[in-house]
């Protein structure tokens, strides 16, 4: 009898301790959430900037892979779109080297929807991932085996949607399709990746430059503002500094990691002091990374484990360099007085 009483007392004591622990944990969580809400409650970035710069403007993002859009524009696209910009996101490849095109394209659309960008604003050019297409080698999709543009089930590649046929995998066709999609929508602003440390990033960057050269020669009155940036050195492979004080700004990559350490960036003519900084709406940020809208979008790219790089990608600004499109040399006929002009 006495032993039963002792057991009941022990059980009661254990239950009381457990309940006390649960209540303590709940109290800590409540206090944390309350303080976090206080820290995160702000008016955000002055929307007059996005309203004055992007309202009723056309903005196009051109990137190699599904998830690269988040690296270079994931934090600025939402305020652009919310303040009246007509946004288009163009993916050059299907990202299908190890994962199906359907998976990558679905992830991209789901991620952008997390940021408020609807699926109809997304364009897939449908070129292969991880090939030597850009240097004239014959290219095939690693996952599908096809040698022409395509899209996953439920999606359409741009060339087929526009012209009724698929485009063969050639460097020239990619340039043609980039030129076509730019001229079709005629964006006022173009955000694109520059000469990054990735084969596809470099190839698409060069293809974009070739397409823009053609466009500027053909359309002398069309001079969109082109902003280019690095998705690897300033995002995917940058410092994991979300919880550091420099969340206020993207930090410059260590020079020894550059293609040539004697320059500040991977493109020699880009000086760090000449970068263009677009502010981030603080409402999309939080002192808890799990609350950040960019983190939620990155979490949709499960095949790439993109959320694991959130501490590197999420920043207090987005950094670009202005690629001038108003140079008279684009319309000039070049000649030489002697020697070989080739």
Predicted features along the sequence, with ranges:
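The feature marks non-catalytic terminal segments
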Residues: 18-33, 45-50, 107, 111-115, ...
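Active-site beta-strand->loop->alpha-helix modules in alpha/beta enzyme cores, enriched
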Residues: 13-20, 26-206, 210-221
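N-terminal Lys/Arg-rich, disordered targeting/topogenic segments
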Residues: 1-13
């Amino acid at each position: 009898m006495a032993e039963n009483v002792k057991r009941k007392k022990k059980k009661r004591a254990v239950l009381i301790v457990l309940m006390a622990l649960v209540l303590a944990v709940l109290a800590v969580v409540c206090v944390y959430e309350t303080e976090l809400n206080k820290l995160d409650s702000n008016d955000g970035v002055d929307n007059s900037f996005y309203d004055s710069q992007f309202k009723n403007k056309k903005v196009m993002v051109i990137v190699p892979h599904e998830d690269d859009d988040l690296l270079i524009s994931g934090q600025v696209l939402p305020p652009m779109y919310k303040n009246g910009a007509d946004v288009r996101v163009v993916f050059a490849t299907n990202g299908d080297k190890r994962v199906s095109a359907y998976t990558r394209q679905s992830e991209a659309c789901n991620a952008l929807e997390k940021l408020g960008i609807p699926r109809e604003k997304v364009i897939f050019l449908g070129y292969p991932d991880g090939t030597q297409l850009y240097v004239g080698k014959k290219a095939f999709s690693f996952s599908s085996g096809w040698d022409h543009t395509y899209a996953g089930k439920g999606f359409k590649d741009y060339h087929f949607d526009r012209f009724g046929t698929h485009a063969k995998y050639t460097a020239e066709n990619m340039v043609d399709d980039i030129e076509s999609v730019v001229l079709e929508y005629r964006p006022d602003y173009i955000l694109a990746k520059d000469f990054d440390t990735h084969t596809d990033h470099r190839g698409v960057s060069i293809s974009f430059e070739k397409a823009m050269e053609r466009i500027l020669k053909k359309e002398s009155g069309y001079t969109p503002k082109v902003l280019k940036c690095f998705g690897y050195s300033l995002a995917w492979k940058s410092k994991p500094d979300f919880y550091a004080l420099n969340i206020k700004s993207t930090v410059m990559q260590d020079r020894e990691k550059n293609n040539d350490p004697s320059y500040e960036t991977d493109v020699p003519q880009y000086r760090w002091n000449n970068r263009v900084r677009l502010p981030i709406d603080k409402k999309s940020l939080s002192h808890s990374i799990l609350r950040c809208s960019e983190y939620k979008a990155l979490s949709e790219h499960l095949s790439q484990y993109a959320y694991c790089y959130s501490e590197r990608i999420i920043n207090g600004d987005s950094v670009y360099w202005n690629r001038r499109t108003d140079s008279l040399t684009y319309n000039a006929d070049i000649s030489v007085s002697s020697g070989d002009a080739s």
